[in-house]
C-alpha cells in the first residue's frame, strides 16, 4: 500500500549544518517530522558539498511521519556572489555595478546548476545565469 502524502515544504539549509535549532527544528517539528533523523540524513547527503552553502530543500512528508527530501544546488546568486567576491548585489543594478565575472565563470556556474535549471543545453543555462547576474548588478566580461 502506498504512503498517504500529507504535504511538502521548502527550506533553505546550509550544507552540512542542519541542526535542531531554529529555523529547521520548529519547521519540521510542527509537521511531525523526526528532526534528528532529518538532520542526520541531510548532513550525510550534503557532506560532499561546500560547507555552509545554502541548499534549497523540498521535504515531502507522509502520514506515517516518514519523509523524503530533494536537495537542490545552491542558488545562482550564491555562486555569482562567490565568483565576483562580493557580499551582496547592487542596490540599483541598472545604474551601478556590484562586481564583475568572466564568461568562463558564468559557464562554470551554468554547468553546476544545469540539473536544476529549466534549460536544454549549456547556452540556455548560461542565459539564465546572465539574467541573474544582470539583476544583481554584476557585469560579465
From Swiss-Prot:
PTM: One or more lysine residues are methylated.
Claim: Oxidoreductase is one of the keywords in the record: no
The organism's place on the tree of life at top rank: Bacteria
SMART domains found in the cross-reference section: RL11
One MF annotation (Gene Ontology) recorded for this entry: structural constituent of ribosome
Gene Ontology BP, a term: translation
A GO term from the CC aspect: cytosolic large ribosomal subunit
The entry's keywords: Methylation, Ribonucleoprotein, Ribosomal protein, RNA-binding, rRNA-binding
Keyword Ribonucleoprotein: yes
Pfam hit, one: Ribosomal_L11_N
Gene3D superfamilies on file: Ribosomal protein L11, C-terminal domain, Ribosomal protein L11/L12, N-terminal domain
Function: Forms part of the ribosomal stalk which helps the ribosome interact with GTP-bound translation factors.
Family assignment from sequence similarity: Belongs to the universal ribosomal protein uL11 family.
Oligomeric and partner information: Part of the ribosomal stalk of the 50S ribosomal subunit. Interacts with L10 and the large rRNA to form the base of the stalk. L10 forms an elongated spine to which L12 dimers bind in a sequential fashion forming a multimeric L10(L12)X complex.
Protein name: Large ribosomal subunit protein uL11
Organism the protein comes from: Ruegeria sp. (strain TM1040)
Gene name, Swiss-Prot/TrEMBL: rplK
